[in-house]
Every structure is written in structure tokens, then in C-alpha cells.
Swiss-Prot record:
EC identifiers of the protein: 3.1.1.3
Catalytic activity: a triacylglycerol + H2O = a diacylglycerol + a fatty acid + H(+)
Compartment annotation: Secreted
UniProt record similarity statement: Belongs to the 'GDSL' lipolytic enzyme family.
GO cellular component: extracellular region; outer membrane
UniProt keyword annotation of Lipid metabolism present: yes
Protein name: Lipase 1
Protein source organism: Photorhabdus luminescens
Record domain Autotransporter: where: 383-645
Enzyme class name: hydrolase
Signal peptide residues on this chain, from the entry's feature table: 1-24
GO molecular function, one term: triacylglycerol lipase activity
Lineage: Bacteria, Pseudomonadati, Pseudomonadota, Gammaproteobacteria, Enterobacterales
Amino acid sequence: MKRSFIFAPGMLALSISAISNAHAYNNLYVFGDSLSDGGNNGRYTVDGINGTESKLYNDFIAQQLGIELVNSKKGGTNYAAGGATAVADLNNKHNTQDQVMGYLASHSNRADHNGMYVHWIGGNDVDAALRNPADAQKIITESAMAASSQVHALLNAGAGLVIVPTVPDVGMTPKIMEFVLSKGGATSKDLAKIHAVVNGYPTIDKDTRLQVIHGVFKQIGSDVSGGDAKKAEETTKQLIDGYNELSSNASKLVDNYNQLEDMALSQENGNIVRVDVNALLHEVIANPLRYGFLNTIGYACAQGVNAGSCRSKDTGFDASKPFLFADDFHPTPEAHHIVSQYTVSVLNAPYRVMLLTNANNVPVKGALASLDGRLQQLRNVDNEQGKLGVFGGYSGNHSHTLTLGSDYQIMDNILLGGMISRYQDNSSPADNFHYDGRGYVFTAYGLWRYYDKGWISGDLHYLDMKYEDITRGIVLNDWLRKENASTSGHQWGGRITAGWDIPLTSAVTTSPIIQYAWDKSYVKGYRESGNNSTAMHFGEQRYDSQVGTLGWRLDTNFGYFNPYAEVRFNHQFGDKRYQIRSAINSTQTSFVSESQKQDTHWREYTIGMNAVITKDWGAFASISRNDGDVQNHTYSFSLGVNASF
């Protein structure tokens, strides 16, 4: 506004310090006004003249993507221009209608499916509406509709994802106060003096900020009154009323524009990442110290100097404290940085939340590890018909699964059983992401021996899972904000495994293994509490897994202590990726994120031992290592004891 104011995380191998590369976004395209202009008409922030010292929000986003953002005049993909509006009627030289249509025309009306787009416009349209009260609503409506139409044009042309920030509140900028003062007769010299006074005050919250503004108006009223107290009071009231009216009108127009655009954006499907910069601005002004700012009503550049030509070494530049504003309308580099952090946090949030899909599988694997130890033990003993067995097991790595089970030998060669497993985990699988997992796995299983050497085992299992205290951290300059939620999930599936024991010696056998496992996982969608700009909601997650396994094992029967070893080669036939739909809480739009392609081939090595303590008491233990499966911990172990009656 020239005239106006990031993939698989943790177990999914996503680097959350940058924008996820689960979808290979390899370029960034930007359309907008001076908030986004990388040099077409200027760079509107402190020390932004040559673009080497200060970065805009979109430069930071490009950096997270691993690319350099270059303005379109130099052949790059940043088409934004200072002073641009959404419609040509308000600025026929610089507008996003021409920016978007020109871009599409030069690319055969095809957008980049692997490209990330930013469309941020509206501040100058609001400014035009303020200057034309009679046509204000018409201007706001037409501009908001035009902006949303341009976004849909990009999506319809194949754009992979479009970031659409809300217009920040013009009514909260220093320009409003200076406009009221100028209208009241203040000269440039007067404004420079007032600017110095305003800059001297720390504005620690919104009330303090308003007190500073009222204090300035009161002092002016006193200065022009000539000692007449009544005149001073009247002048002060006129200035305060004028400021309140103009600021309120500007804020209402901004809210109206943002609401209209959001409604229009939501009318069609599309991958739209809405980021509420307007709400973020209000949050910063309400508590600036939290975000590293000391003044939100003054600005760093000298009075009358546009941010596009402002240098920190210039005479009149105020480096005494961190300011929110560079000039009377444009943000400082620090403010741009916080916008980029916020935007990247929204983009990366789904990849953190998708960790829960894989987390669903952890208690199931833990329970089945204990079951496998029990079944291995049963295959190596002569279990008489009518024998009742009970066992308890523990498995884990970074989590804990306790199992209690019982089985019954209904025939000489057929055994049936059931077990219940309790899972507990306090997990932080990625930076600034934590959850407490609690769940129960219910399993029914059976073992059939045939022709003395052949065996088939099968199981059916169901997981009931609760995720409490899901905490997502968002770093905003010096402040770590946390969003909280809870949800639930379940998983059900089954396995069938077969082998044939081949004697090598009287105490050693070997066996090929074939297994098919199927699981269906579900995590309920949830909404983070609160109405912060960063609070989001996430859709349900579903994932089908079908794994075929070939392997070989070696078993011993030495008596009291019987070691065994096994190697398995696994192939995933089910879903290779999973998706989630997400959005900030304050929008009607949403976007879909897709995980990285999951490993389709991996190996699993297991060594273990079962022990015969007495005739009716035994124990078992094993340790397994996954190789090539980043979705699961590299090592896990299981141990248990059993008794028979």
C-alpha cells in the first residue's frame, strides 16, 4: 500500500523449521501493493532501498522455500507494486487485476501447480473509500469481489496454493492521527515536533496508546487556546472526536472488506491459505512488549519521509526503540518478520497435526509386539487341550504399552485368546508440538497348528485413542504463543501370518514367514480453543494400510532359555500419502495439505528369547529394529511373563 499502510515432521521426516516440502513448492509468485513490492515501485520499509539490508515478509517466506524472490522488473515472480489497488478504476496504472491477468497471459493462462502464490491487496482500496464517503461501500464491495475473483482465476488456472492475508486495520496506523492534525491546521513543522513527542512514549498496551494520542490532542488544544480553558477543551474534543470517527470508519471499512472477500473466496473450492494479519496487528498493539515492540503509534523514519526512501542512517531516523511502523503507514522489517513467521506457522501446522495419524499406529504395534512374543512361545511348547494361559507384557521405546491377555487351548491344535493393552505417551515429536496420548487396544487372536510343522496365526484388533493437551507452539518474534486442543482417534485391523517349521537339528528349526496386515486409521478433526489469529481447525484424518510381508526366522528349543531371530521384508500396498484440510478459525476458506510419500519397502530385524522358568511359568523378551521405515521408531522392545493352568 504505497499511500497506505512451512514437509514430514519428526516421524514423518518433515523439517518444520522450513515450509514443508511434502508438496514440492518450487517457486513463489506475489501479487499486491507496497506491503509486498520487492522493488517494482520501491521497497517500503526501513533500509529496504536496495533490498539487501531489510527483508519483507515474502522474502522470508521465499527463504523458507529455499529460493530468492526477485521483482518482475528484473524478470522475477514478484509482481506487486506500491500504490496498487484491486481494481483498475482506482488505479489504472498499478492494480492486481493487471498483475494477475498479465501473468496468466504470459504463461498461456496456466498457473504453476507446484507454485505457491500470495495475493495481498486492499489497503489502497480502503484508502480510496475513506476519501470518498459517498461511494465508500461501492468501492469496498467492488474491490473485495475483484480480489477474490483474481484469486479464483489463479486457482482455476492450476495454482497449487494461494496465500491471501487479510487487510491490516488502516484505522490503527499513525497516518490517521497525522491526517486529523493536518486537517486541524498543523504544519509540517508541527507534525515533526508531534512525531518526536509521540516517539518518546512507550505504548505498552492499547489503552496507553490511546492515552498518548489524547495527550497530544490535549496539548495542542492548550497551545492554541491562548489560555482560554473552554477553547482548549473544545479544541481537544474536536480533535479526539475527529480521530475517533476517522479511525472507526477506517476500521469498519477494513472489516467489511475482509468479510466480503472471505465470503467470496469461500464460494468456490480452492487451496486458499487465509492468514489474519488484521487480527495479528490488533494482538501486537494490545501487548507490543510480548512481540518485541515498544512503540505502536509513532514510527522510526523521520516525519514526512516515505518508507520507500527511509534509511536508518538518515538524519531524523529514530533508533531509540523498536517500532511497529516504519513510516506513518508501512511496517518495519521486524513487523514483516512476524507476519512471515505467522504465515509459515499456518502453512506448517497441518504437517505437525498429521503426526497423529502415525501416532495412532504406535499403541497397536506395541500391543502386537507383546502378542508376537506370546505366540512365538506357544509355537515352541506342547500346549495340552484345555490348558488356560495368562500373560502380561510391556513394550515400548519412547512410549509405554502394558498388555494383559489370556488364551485357551480348545483343541490339540487350535488356541484362541484375547488381550487388552493400555498405551500412554507424552510426546513431543516435533519442535513446538506436543500431545499426551492415552489409549486401549483390544485384540482377539488364534493359533492353528497343522501337520505338526505348519502354523497359521491371526488377530483382530481395535484401538480407542484419546489425544489430550495437543499443544502447538508458534514463535512470533520474541514470543512463543501456544494453541491448545484435544481430539480422539481409533484404528482397527487384522493380521494373518503363516509359517512352516523346518528342523535343522533336534533343538533348532527354521521357517519361512508370510504375513498380510490391514489397518484402517482415523483421527477426529478438531478445533483449537480461543480466537487468536493463530488458532486453527483441522479436518479428520483417514489412512488405510495394507502391508505384505515375507520373512525368515530361526527358533531354538534348548530347554530353559530359547533364543530366536527373525528378519522380515515388508511392502506397503495401501495409502502412500495422507491428507488433511486446515484453516485458521476466523475464515470460511481452507486448504489441503498432503504428507510426503510414505516408505513402501522396509526391513525389520528381531532377536528374542523365551524362557521356561517352571512347568507352568515362563517369560519372553525381544528387541526389534526397523530399517527404512521413518514412520516408526528405529528400535523397540517387548518383554512379558506368562502362566498356565
